[in-house]
Amino acid sequence: MIEAFNLNMIWAAVAAALVVLAVGPFLIPELHKLKFGQSIREEGPKSHQAKSGTPTMGGIMIVGGITIATLIFADFTIEVALALFVMLGHFVLGFLDDYIKVVLKRNLGLKAKQKLLGQFIIAIIVTYIGINYTGLTQDVWIPFIGQTYDIGWFYYVLVIGVLIGTTNAVNLTDGLDGLASGAMAVASLGFAAVCLYFNKANLAIYSFACFGACVAFLKFNYHPAKVFMGDTGSLALGGVLAGLGILTKTELLLIILGGLFVIETLSVIIQVTSF
């Protein structure tokens, strides 16, 4: 694990953070001018009403920071390309969702089936290329036990479930100032350790880049938030987690590393089903 560590990982975190810190002061006023502000329903809590009009789509700077830092400091392997593809694919879905809600004033954004179709396509492409070109197997690794089980074609179903579950979990957590970005910083640092353990240095660089971008974003997103990441950021960051879980064969470890997201999702499910 220590042998796999190199300074490019630290530089990637620093570079991603600098991109976010440099872009933020210019992007946030532009989002204000374009009226890319978040709408808060009138029946919501008074504390949330103050957030009405706060620019959203701040995830643009996070994704930009991660992408630039990864391309500079990581070798552009198929694994890195797939990781970026998962993130950028969900970034596009999130951007379209935010644009429809904020600019076109259609509160529901993309239809659920449209999002699911996009995620289904991303999952199939990643799984097919991963299995055929990176040595990705259809085995599932059980954490702590260390056993692997070949689940055959059902692995495609698992990948789709991981993508949809993880991205929506991060999306649900993006309701409080700094919560999603802070939780993602912790989770990405955890995955950096996982990548180092499995000697996947380039994916570790990608993880460190995510860590740096999320920590820097807290400057603008910590209470009181000057900008929200929006679906643009939350879906993309969910894609980061899901992609790392899939490419390191630690899909089930996501439940632990993304523990806060799991708790938040369960909380929402309990609240919805109890009414």
Language-model segment annotations:
Residues I40-T54, I78-E79, N202-Y206:
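Alpha-helical transmembrane segments and immediately membrane-proximal extracytoplasmic
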Residues F26-K51, L96-L108, I269-F275:
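Cytosolic, membrane-interface loops and tails of multi-pass inner-membrane proteins
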Residues M1-I2, V103, T134-Q147:
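Membrane-interface helix termini and inter-helical loops of multi-pass transporters
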Residues G53, P143-F154:
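Short aromatic-rich membrane-water interface segments that cap or initiate transmembrane helices
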Residues F76-K111, K115-L116:
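Hydrophobic alpha-helical hairpins/lids featuring a short glycine-rich hinge
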Residues F91-L96, F120-N132:
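Mid-bilayer segments of alpha-helical transmembrane spans in multi-pass integral membrane proteins
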Residues M1-E30, I62-V92, V126, F154-L158, ...:
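Alpha-helical transmembrane segments
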